[in-house]
C-alpha cells in the first residue's frame, strides 16, 4: 500500500486548506483507477510556532503505484498550494515500503513527538532518508514534518474520531458562506452526543461553519460515521462541490501529558494537579487568572493525573519512549507555582474559574505558554468548605477587631479578647466534577467532556 503524507499547503490569511487539496488528490487517484482506503486528518502540537491555522497534516492510504502518487500529489500541490505566503512551506512524504500498520518505530516515535513536542526540518529529512521514503518540499518544505508524522499516525495512535467536511464551489471562496443555521442547530440536536461541537447553543453559534477564507463550507465532528453524515445531509446550504470523510485524532486530548508544577515546559500541554493559592482575578480584557501551588503527591494523585485518556495512552510502548527531540527549544519552568488563565473567548467557562477559592485542589488541562497554563478544562478534586474570619464577641455579638500583629482579636465595645479566628461555612456552587470551555472556544485536539471516559462526573458544554 502507498501512504501519502501532506502538510502546510494553506495560509492563515489567503485561504486554501490541506484537507481540500488532499481531497482533490484522492479524487484524482480514483479517476486514475486507484482506490483510497483511508483518509487521516492528524492534529499536531497546537503550540508550534510555524503553523498555518489548525496545524493539521493529512495521510492518504491508497493502492495506487507510488510513481503515480508522486506525480498526482506534486501536480496538485504545484497548482493549489498557497505559494505567495512566506509562512506556507508545503511538503509531501510518500512510501510504499511498508503498510500503514508497520511503519518503522522511529517514524511512530516521530509522530508522537510531532503531537507533543517539536521537530526541525533537518532532523525530519534525515529520518525520511534513513527509512527510504520519497519526499519533496516547496519553499523550504517545512510541511515534511507534518507529512511524516501523518505517515506514522495509523501505527502510532489508537483512538480516533470522525470529521465529515463539505467544500464549497471553489469560485465562491472569499465570499460569505450561505448556510442555514437553523437547519444546523436542528440536525445537531438530533444526533447529539454521537455528533459534538457542531454548534454552541449558549452563544448561538454554528461553530462547524468556519470564518476563515478557504474552501471549507462546514465540518461535522463526532464518533459515528453514519451520524456525522446524517447531520451533513440535513444542513441547508449553498451548493456542496465535494465532500470528504476523515478519520482523525481531533477531540481526543492526545496532546496532554501528565505533569507536575515545577517541571512544566513552555509550548507543551499538560494535565497537572495543584492547590489554588490565589483568589481568581479578572484582568483587563475579561481574562481570568488564578494561581496553583505544589502539593504533596500521593498514589491517588497519580491516578487523577492519568485520568481521561491518559490511562489508555500509557499502554502504548511507543508513547512511553517519547521524549523531546529538541530539548533546548525552551527552558523548564522550575517555579513552585503555575498561573492559569481562562481567556475572554472561553466565555461562560470563566464563571467556573471565578468560583474557585484558595485551598481548592484541582486538576487543570492546557498548554503552557510564557509560564502560564491556558485552561482547556479542569476538575475539582477537593473543595474548601470553610473560611477563617474574625471571631464574634460572645458578650455583645459584634465582630472583633485585630488587636495587633500576633496579638489576637479584641472587642472594642466590651474589651473581650480572643486568640483564635472563627470558621465560617462557605456556600460552594462548584462540585467534584470536570468543567470545560464551550464549543466556540475549544481547540481542535481537545476532548469534549461529552465523549466520556473521565474519572469524575462532568459538566459538558453544548
UniProtKB/Swiss-Prot annotation:
Pfam families: TiaS_FLD, TiaS_TCKD, Zn_ribbon_TiaS. The keyword Cytoplasm applies. Its EC number is 6.3.4.22. The keyword Nucleotide-binding applies. It is found in: Cytoplasm. It comes from the Archaea. GO terms for biological process: tRNA wobble cytosine modification. GO terms for molecular function: ATP binding; ligase activity, forming carbon-nitrogen bonds. One of its GO terms (cellular component) is cytoplasm. InterPro entries: TiaS-like_TCKD (IPR053870), TiaS_FLD (IPR013696), tRNA_Ile2__agm2C_synt (IPR024913), Zn_ribbon_TiaS (IPR055394). Transmembrane segments: none annotated. Keywords: ATP-binding, Cytoplasm, Ligase, Nucleotide-binding, tRNA processing. Belongs to the TiaS family. ATP-dependent agmatine transferase that catalyzes the formation of 2-agmatinylcytidine (agm2C) at the wobble position (C34) of tRNA(Ile2), converting the codon specificity from AUG to AUA. This is tRNA(Ile2) 2-agmatinylcytidine synthetase TiaS. It comes from Haloquadratum walsbyi (strain DSM 16790 / HBSQ001).
Amino acid at each position: 500500500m502507498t501512504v501519502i503524507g501532506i502538510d502546510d499547503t494553506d495560509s492563515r490569511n489567503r485561504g486554501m486548506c490541506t484537507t481540500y487539496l488532499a481531497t482533490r488528490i484522492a479524487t484524482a487517484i480514483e479517476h486514475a483507477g486507484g482506490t483510497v482506503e483511508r483518509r487521516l486528518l492528524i492534529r499536531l502540537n497546537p503550540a508550534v510556532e510555524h503553523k498555518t491555522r489548525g496545524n493539521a497534516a493529512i495521510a492518504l492510504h491508497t493502492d495506487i503505484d507510488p510513481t503515480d502518487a508522486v506525480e498526482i500529489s506534486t501536480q496538485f500541490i504545484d497548482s493549489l498550494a498557497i505559494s505567495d505566503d512566506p509562512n506556507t512551506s508545503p511538503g509531501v512524504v510518500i512510501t510504499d515500503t511498508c503498510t500503514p500498520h508497520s511503519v518503522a518505530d522511529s517514524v511512530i516515535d516521530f509522530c508522537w513527538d510531532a503531537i507533543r513536542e517539536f521537530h526541525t526540518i533537518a532532523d525530519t529529512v534525515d529520518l525520511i532518508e534513513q527509512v527510504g521514503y520519497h519526499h519533496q518540499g516547496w519553499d523550504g518544505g517545512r510541511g515534511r514534518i507534518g507529512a511524516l508524522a501523518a505517515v506514522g499516525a495509523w501505527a502510532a495512535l489508537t483512538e480516533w474520531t470522525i470529521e465529515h467536511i463539505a467544500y464549497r464551489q471553489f469560485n465562491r471562496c472569499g465570499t460569505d458562506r450561505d448556510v442555514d443555521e437553523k437547519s444546523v442547530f436542528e440536525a445537531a440536536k438530533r444526533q447529539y452526543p454521537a455528533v459534538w461541537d457542531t454548534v454552541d447553543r449558549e452563544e448561538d453559534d454554528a461553530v462547524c461553519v468556519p470564518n476563515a477564507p478557504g474552501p471549507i463550507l462546514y465540518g461535522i465532528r463526532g464518533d459515528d460515521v453514519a451520524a456525522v453524515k446524517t447531520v451533513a445531509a440535513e444542513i441547508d446550504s449553498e451548493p456542496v462541490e465535494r465532500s470528504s470523510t476523515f478519520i482523525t485524532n481531533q477531540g481526543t486530548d492526545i496532546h496532554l501529558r501528565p505533569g507536575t508544577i515545577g517541571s512544566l515546559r513552555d509550548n507543551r500541554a499538560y494535565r497537572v494537579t495543584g492547590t489554588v493559592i490565589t483568589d481568581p482575578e479578572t484582568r483587563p480584557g475579561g481574562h481570568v487568572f488564578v494561581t496553583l501551588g505544589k502539593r504533596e503527591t500521593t498514589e491517588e494523585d497519580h491516578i487523577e493525573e492519568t485520568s481521561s485518556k491518559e490511562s489508555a495512552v500509557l499502554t502504548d510502548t511507543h508513547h512511553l519512549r517519547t521524549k523531546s527531540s529538541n530539548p533546548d527549544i525552551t527552558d523548564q519552568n522550575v517555579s513552585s507555582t503555575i498561573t492559569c488563565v481562562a481567556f475572554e473567548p472561553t466565555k461562560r467557562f470563566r464563571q467556573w474559574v471565578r468560583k474557585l477559592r484558595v485551598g481548592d485542589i484541582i486538576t487543570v488541562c492546557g498548554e503552557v505558554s510564557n509560564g502560564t497554563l491556558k485552561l482547556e478544562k479542569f476538575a475539582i478534586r477537593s473543595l474548601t468548605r470553610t473560611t477563617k474570619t474574625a471571631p464574634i464577641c460572645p458578650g455583645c455579638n459584634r465582630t472583633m477587631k485585630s488587636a495587633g500583629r500576633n496579638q489576637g482579636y479584641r472587642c472594642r465595645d466590651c474589651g473581650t479578647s480572643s486568640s483564635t479566628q472563627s470558621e465560617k461555612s462557605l456556600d460552594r456552587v462548584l462540585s467534584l466534577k470536570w468543567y470545560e470551555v464551550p464549543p466556540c472556544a475549544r481547540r481542535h485536539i481537545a476532548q469534549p467532556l461529552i465523549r466520556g471516559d473521565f474519572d469524575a462526573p462532568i459538566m459538558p458544554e453544548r
